[in-house]
A protein has these predicted regions:
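Extracellular adhesion/carbohydrate-binding repeat motifs centered on closely spaced tryptophans
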Residues: 1-192
């Protein structure tokens, strides 16, 4: 009786501990890898998405039939899959290279050249490469500031790298020019 991952007729198939063939499900073999087995043939699927037991969990299985992880370019989309192979949607993620990325809540596509809101009402801006920007940035007609974690600064006085002191509006985050603003300790500044 077959058990585990077996190759039959050039196709990988999976049999549970009782010897029953797994079909239409994701299974983890002894090698620790996740694979999806087609609901009709039972063959390991390749180059396709499959839904997990939880309806919100999606996986993508590469050419080798194994669930992909990390940043992946699939067609015209750049997507991210966590260490368990689940597609990440609607979240801010810090990658191994320390870059901060956001993946759309509906499509899972990486945000590029746009703002996205984090889980605690903080705002980020993602550049053309999909990385959260930091420091002083000119975006459209506005000059904005983002902290070292990529979060937009609003309603605060900030000392920039050049030692200049700037204030960023509490609503828009735009740098104050030609106006007074109150600091955190009731001190007033004029920004020209």
């Amino acid at each position: 009786m077959a058990r585990g991952l077996v190759t039959m007729g050039g196709n990988q198939q999976f049999f549970d501990q009782n010897g029953y063939q797994v079909k239409g499900k994701i299974a983890r073999a002894k090698d620790g890898q996740l694979r999806y087995f087609d609901k009709d043939s039972g063959n390991a699927a390749a180059n396709r998405f499959a839904q997990g037991d939880n309806p919100s969990d999606w996986y993508y299985f590469g050419a080798d039939g194994v669930a992909v992880t990390g940043l992946q370019k699939l067609g015209q989309q750049t997507l991210y899959f966590d260490q368990d192979g689940k597609q990440v949607k609607g979240k801010i993620v810090t990658l191994a290279d320390k870059s901060i990325r956001y993946f759309d809540a509906n499509s899972g596509e990486m945000a590029v050249s746009k703002f996205a809101e984090g889980s605690k009402n903080e705002w980020y801006y993602f550049d053309q490469a999909g990385k959260a920007v930091t420091g002083l940035q000119k975006i459209g007609q506005q000059t904005l500031y983002f902290d070292q974690d990529g979060k937009q600064v609003k309603g605060k006085v900030v000392t920039l790298a050049d030692k200049s002191i700037r204030y960023f509006d509490a609503n828009s985050g735009e740098m104050a020019v030609g106006k007074f603003a109150e600091g955190a300790k009731n001190e007033w500044y004029y920004f020209d």
